Structures are given as structure tokens and as C-alpha cells.
From Swiss-Prot:
HAMAP family: RapZ_like. This is Nucleotide-binding protein Acry_0446. GTP binds at D54, A55, R56, T57. The keyword Ligase does not apply. Belongs to the RapZ-like family. One of its GO terms (molecular function) is GTP binding. InterPro entries: P-loop_NTPase, RapZ-like, RapZ-like_N, RapZ_C. The lineage of its organism: Bacteria, Pseudomonadati, Pseudomonadota, Alphaproteobacteria, Acetobacterales. It comes from the Bacteria.
Length: 303
């Protein structure tokens, strides 16, 4: 067997799309919701493949998904791993409420009815899964860490996640290092900057003018220059550095952006996550963070 393949399924709102994006970021070719009858044709060469299927997939049935996996194994070219993404009904209902989206299986019913219907449709897949990942109390960065640890290809090296957050929301539990930026001048008190964020160059320029900023940023840069190569030497595959401020919008975001730019210029593999803004950046491309739960600890992963 030469190719590696994972099939990602689960409950709507649990984070299946986030898992597919995480797999794509670490080198997989990701295909979402192809008709089941063509899945076997997608396996070619040594390129690792991630296929997303759910109740919206054409011709979907749990039995057909398992039959497809059996046929791929019989061919001998690949042994697909089945990942099932789940979350508690309370977490799913909260996410659908926050995004104001209708559950795809709710039809004229309620979100809770849609969740119950999908749980019944996918129960066989959950029972057959190689991995069950519960995202109820899992942050996006924590989910990405699990995916990288379990399904990483060993190519890109250590992954660095830089996180900005607001202290009222709590510290990121998965962080290896937390830095407090609240001693820096606060753009919140400048009327022209209050409604902007650290993604805005004007906000970053204002923070750079703080007399304490140059030495602080130099010391942070020196610390990362010292630590990161040693983390790599230790065999660490993932590290998270978090910056906090009062609201999680100005100072922490600015520091994450500036350090992220510096590390990317040094060819480090960097993911940026702004928890209070609900966004993330991979290689400089911004994406929304649907359903990301802030400041939550990582749960266990069932195998």
C-alpha cells in the first residue's frame, strides 16, 4: 500500500470542514462531498488523500461508505482510516445559533431534531470509525494539533501557532508560552483606533510608538529565536505561543501579526489564530473560524 487516505465524516457543525482544511494544510489533497461512486477513482499515486463525506453527500448512506472502504482495502492500494467528528448536542445547538445557519437535516423541524436525525443516520459510521474526535470543548488550534499529531506526514517540520486572546475569555489552555501585552499603550482609548483591530497597520504603528515596545519585541524575538530550534531538536511537532490583552482586539493581535511575519520570513511554518476576532491565517491567507470554541482544554481522542 503506497498512498495514505483518510475519510472524514461526522455530525454537521462538529468541525468536519475544519479537519479537512487542517489535513490540506499538512499536505493532503482534500476533496469534499464527492459522490460515493467516484471515491475509488480519486486514489492515484502516492499523494495522500482526505475525502469528506456527510449526510449531504449524494447517494449517502453509512452502509455505502463502509462498502467503499471495503472495496478500497480489497484493491490493496490503500487502507483508508475513518475519522468521525462529533460534539455534544448542546455544543452543536450553540454553534448553529451563533452562525444563524439551518441544520441541513432539520428541514421544517428544529435544530435539535436535525441533530437527532443525523446521529441516527451516522451511528454505524461512528461505531466503525478508527478515530472519534469530540470537539465540544476543543479549540481550533487544539483540533489542528490533534490532526497534525495523528495524521501528519512528517514533511513540513514543527508547526507554530500564534494566538491572540482577551483575558476576560480565559487563557488558551493548550499554550506552551503566554505573554501579557497589557502594559503597552492601549489603542482602545484613541477614538480613531477604537473600532479598528491589530490587523490594521495604523493600530500596529500606534503600538510601535510605545517607548516599551522596541525592547519588548526584541526580547520576544530573541526568546523565540532561542527556543524554537531547541524545540525542533527535542522532536516537538507543535508549539503554541499566546499573546493576551484586555479585549483581544488591538495589542495582542498586533504582536501576533508582527511576530508571525518575522517567523514566516525565517521560513517557519506558522498558523495565526485571533480568538476574539474569530479568524485564522495560514501562510497569510485569512479564513473565518466557524464554531471555534475559545480557551477550552483539549479532550481525549477515542481510537
Amino acid at each position: 500500500m503506497s498512498a495514505r487516505m483518510v475519510i472524514v465524516t461526522g455530525l454537521s457543525g462538529a468541525g468536519r470542514n475544519s479537519v479537512l482544511r487542517a489535513l490540506e494544510d499538512i499536505g493532503y489533497e482534500a476533496v469534499d462531498n464527492p459522490p460515493l461512486r467516484i471515491v475509488e477513482t480519486l486514489v492515484r499515486g502516492d499523494k495522500p488523500l482526505a475525502v469528506g463525506v456527510d449526510a449531504r453527500t449524494r447517494d449517502f448512506s453509512a452502509e455505502d461508505v463502509l462498502s467503499t472502504i471495503d472495496r478500497l482495502q480489497t484493491r490493496g492500494c490503500v487502507r483508508p482510516e475513518l475519522i468521525f467528528i462529533t460534539a455534544s448536542p448542546e455544543a452543536l445547538q450553540r454553534r448553529f445559533s451563533e452562525t444563524r445557519r439551518r441544520h441541513p437535516l432539520a428541514l421544517a423541524g428544529t435544530v435539535s431534531e436535525g441533530i437527532e436525525t443525523e446521529q441516527a443516520l451516522t451511528r454505524t459510521l461512528r461505531n466503525a470509525a478508527d478515530w472519534v474526535i469530540d470537539t465540544s470543548e476543543l479549540s481550533l488550534a487544539g483540533l489542528r494539533q490533534i490532526i497534525d499529531q495523528r495524521f501528519g506526514l512528517g514533511g513540513p517540520g514543527m508547526s507554530i501557532t500564534l494566538v491572540s486572546f482577551g483575558y476576560p475569555s480565559g487563557l488558551p489552555q493548550e499554550a506552551d508560552l503566554v505573554l501579557d501585552t497589557r502594559f503597552l499603550r492601549n489603542p482602545h482609548y484613541i477614538p480613531d483606533l477604537r473600532d479598528r483591530t491589530g490587523l490594521d497597520p495604523q493600530v500596529r504603528d500606534y503600538i510601535r510608538q510605545d517607548p516599551d515596545f522596541p525592547e519588548f519585541f526584541e526580547r520576544v524575538s530573541g526568546l523565540t529565536d532561542y527556543l524554537l530550534p531547541r524545540f525542533v531538536r527535542e522532536g516537538k511537532k507543535y508549539v503554541m505561543i499566546a499573546f493576551g490583552c484586555t479585549g483581544g482586539k488591538h495589542r495582542s493581535v498586533s504582536l501576533v501579526e508582527m511576530l508571525g511575519s518575522r517567523l514566516r520570513n525565517a521560513d517557519w511554518n506558522v498558523l495565526i489564530e485571533h480568538r476574539s476576532l474569530g479568524s485564522r491565517s495560514v501562510g497569510g491567507a485569512w479564513k473565518a473560524m466557524p464554531g471555534a470554541h475559545q480557551g477550552a482544554p483539549m479532550p481525549g481522542v477515542q481510537k
